Swiss-Prot record:
This is Recombination protein RecR. It comes from Francisella tularensis subsp. tularensis (strain SCHU S4 / Schu 4). Gene3D superfamilies: 3.40.1360.10, 6.10.250.240, RecR Domain 1 (1.10.8.420). Belongs to the RecR family. The keyword Zinc applies. One of its GO terms (molecular function) is DNA binding.
Amino acid sequence: MTSKIFSPKISAVIESLRKLPTIGKKSSQRLALYLLDKSPETAIAIANSLLDATANIKKCVYCQALTEDDVCNICSNTNRDNTKLCIIESMLDMIAIEEAGIYRGKYFVLNGRISPLDGIGPSELKLDILQQIIADRKIDEVILAISPTVEGETTAHFISQMIAKDIKISRIGFGVPFGGELEYLDQQTLLHAFNARTNI
């Protein structure tokens, strides 16, 4: 509940902002008051860009990354190595890997991890699409770049079991602590993690 000093419309903005990751009560209040009082033009610009994006952004038919086109820039890039497939949890992981400049293959974005307690199973992660991609392409290595959490370990194990035995499966390792999230690793640690990946 927001404070009674706020009107219903201001409270609605505050509550909406609180739904964002890492935004707590105080931060949502500060953001709402800044946007409404100090920079209403910014609020309108943000609202318009979000409306436009939600109407036009979809998931790439291959890797499940967010894109405006049916196929994203990475999947449509013929200079990428089509024989390597890196499986990641989110687009934030893709950004981290791309910015580190350590990988030139293709991706598959799970958009989550298997977590039965949260109602997330293989179908929610589109693993049927992943299986089809692996079957259709001449992939010689699948790289599991999944965070070493309990859910991440479950997800990595499930995926490794569904991949054909003649395909090399590796897992990034060095420098990624248990419970750590890939997106928060610095580029040097990520480089070591990729170079020190182990076969499953």
